[in-house]
Amino acid sequence: MYKNFLLAVFPLLIQSEKDAFSIFDLDFWNYNAGIVMNFGDSYDDFTYMENRMDLNFFKNNFSAWLQYEYSDPPELGFSIKDLRKYRIEYSSGPWSIKYGDIYEVWGRGLVLAQLDDQGIDFDNSSRGYLINYLSDNISVTQMSGETVNAQLGADLRHPEFEFTHNIDATNINFEAYPFSYGLSFLQSNELHQLKPLGVMDTVDINHRLHGAYISWFGSNMDIFIEYMDKQSKSRTFQTNFSGQEIESLTPLKRGSAAYFNSNYYLGNWSLFFEYKRYSFDRLNPVDTDYIINNYGNRIDYQVMPILYREQNHSFLGRAAHQTNANDERGYQVELSGGLSNGFQVVTQFSHLSRNDTWESISPIEWNRKNISGLLPTTNFSALPYLEFYAELNGYLLNNRLQFKTAIGTNEEVTKVNRFFKGLSNTISENWTYTDSIWYGEDWFYLDSQIVSMDTSINQIETMLYQKSKSFTIPIDLTLSLKNGYSVGLGLAYQERYKNNVKKGNAGGFYNYADSTWILNDETNPNHSSNETTSNYPNETPFQINRMFSLSIGKASKWALTLNYDWTNVQEI
């Protein structure tokens, strides 16, 4: 189908020129090029070399983009020495057509947001075609294509899994100032790989996403709301007596997502608020595999807002939250504005958690309870995350010295191994020996019998979870000199805590015969322990990170930066 589409579009380019063969002359086109080269080496043989060249051609109503990559090996993924990306575009009046690697963003990405992130080897573009009709107050987009995504497994550098999506999607957007409306639909047939390498073990899944969004713009505020509903079904195929292949769909999972944001402006100050509730899958706090074995939930086309601050400092980025796009709710508030002396202030707070609290009835059986209302919880079994950030920046010395200082803190429960709080029956058996024999210099017991059983009801509490928190202070100074020269100085200090927290009057032992958690001390059921241990080597209480950077440069010409980063203990 795609080849036929290209054959239909290509003659338009030929016919639009008097000399048809002139399109093969490089001087015929307006063009530009860009090159990205990355190289890295380390003492543990982690070597990579990445080279990418982008070429952009444009002439009249036509444009084209090519990307050639020579990476052997890349930082992440498999080696490539070939044309990696291409796209041609043609527009005429209200119509535009694209063929090749398509990147689109609809709404805030609850249905579709396509991007290419080389840093994490993520690319959810679709190779196919897109047709768009745009008039004064309406835009209609229809696209179809195929996406092949690679996923890491046990090997953290080379992908071991592959997911293939064939999609058809439509987006309609209406403009009626001060309102804007949108409707989205996406259907994907996914071939989902379950086992790495070797013999392929796959499952066929059909995903259907329906979404709607609306925005409103006022004189001192704006509002955006988006909601989507998702259904997934497993696909099986059977051949009937006539030799026809019949598709059968079986319901698999159903989920939804809601997102809201609003900006309020008052003079030099602005208040930003956003809220999310994503619910596509529910896994207990021990099971974190939302990708390989638990399928039918969020798909890679859904790149949704995360609702915590995207940091540009490496220390703050290291402590960032690992978002859960399948099961998470929360909000973020940011207040920013200018002071009378010209300084700028930014403050931000974020609170996230899962949609349920969890209780481990046994080490392998969990019960969940939905969190009431709309807001997140601080209950540790819902894996809460809290973040605070404050920044002050501005200029001194007649605007020659630019400074930025900040403080960032966060706290998170990353994993819950067990949590039970309630009544439990404890059964004690009393045995007596009924037969014995003297042999050598000692008695040997040959038989015994139970004489009594005591049952007691105790209040049980047992919990074991992992908790992390951090405290970071970065400072950046940049002094402007004459003739465009500048000198920069950066300092940063960070403390990171990673702890195991163990509490309760029962430990991790469970009696499956009696279906009860075993007390630490059966003679004293009320005896409870409270223990916090560090996850860092040698029981180091916390990690201290420090960074020093010095940079010298000339505007629009060159820059040289020296970074020195040291820590008191390495990660496990």
Language-model features: where?
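Beta-barrel outer-membrane channel/assembly domains of diderm bacteria
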Residues: 16-113, 120-144, 163-176, 183, ...
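Solenoidal tandem-repeat scaffolds enriched in leucines and small polar residues
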Residues: 148, 152-205
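Sec-dependent N-terminal signal peptides
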Residues: 4-13
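Extended hydrophobic/aromatic-rich secondary-structure runs
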Residues: 1, 73-80, 316-321, 334
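Sequence/structural signature of outer-membrane beta-barrel proteins
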Residues: 34-42, 69-75, 95, 102-117, ...
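Positively charged n-region of N-terminal signal peptides that target proteins for export
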Residues: 1-4, 341
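Electropositive, surface-exposed helix/loop patches at the edges of structured domains
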Residues: 102, 133, 139, 172, ...
